[in-house]
Amino acid sequence: MDKNISFTLKVWRQKGPKDKGHFDTFQMKDIPGDTSFLEMMDILNEQLINEGKEPIVFDHDCREGICGMCSMYINGHPHGPATGATTCQIYMRRFKDGDTITVEPWRSAGFPVIRDLMVDRSAYDKIMQAGGYVSIKTGGIPDANAIPIAKPIADEAMDAAACIGCGACVAACKNGSAMLFVSAKVSQLALLPQGKVEAARRAKAMLSKMDELGFGNCTNTRACEAECPKLVSISNIARLNREFIAAKLKD
């Protein structure tokens, strides 16, 4: 059975995107090791509410590592110290008694702070609206099974489609680049017959929108790949670059 731990929790507080932020420090006592990180935040918020204080605002939804909304920067890592896991999949057993845990929001010009630990990630939605879809007629439901796709290609497309759009890649990147996200969304369609028809338009449109929204460029530090909770490979960025160059040559 996991032991209870006590630790110091430093949490970033900020009223809005234009306001100056600061850290608040809390002493957490006897938190069970099998408590998830978000459950620990719930415990803290319950204490704050009981004391008549403002609870900490943070984003969450499924709490199962699927939705990507639990965007917290924990001790210098997007989603915390674990590999291949989101914040909601982190348990307090990963920390030691007496630790100091620092929690911040994603830091990026493309993700302005809404309040405290919650950021506005609607920029990703705008990038997807620019071209992250198939608009051509692809036939009825049975037709998909009639199109042969080699298993290695299907596997690559599925690996790219594992991206949950959480924004950890942007938070990890020193340039605030969204290239891993964009490349995953481009790759999952460019690899399949249904997506090839609009491949050129898609690559140009999504990269253009990424630049327009203030995200930086990729300089191959691979920090995004190291911190991605779904282990999306930067080989997708190479594919995106090939797709973009091929599209520009057709202009």
Give the ranges of each region predicted by the language model.
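Functionalized membrane-embedded alpha-helices
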Residues: 66, 72-74, 224
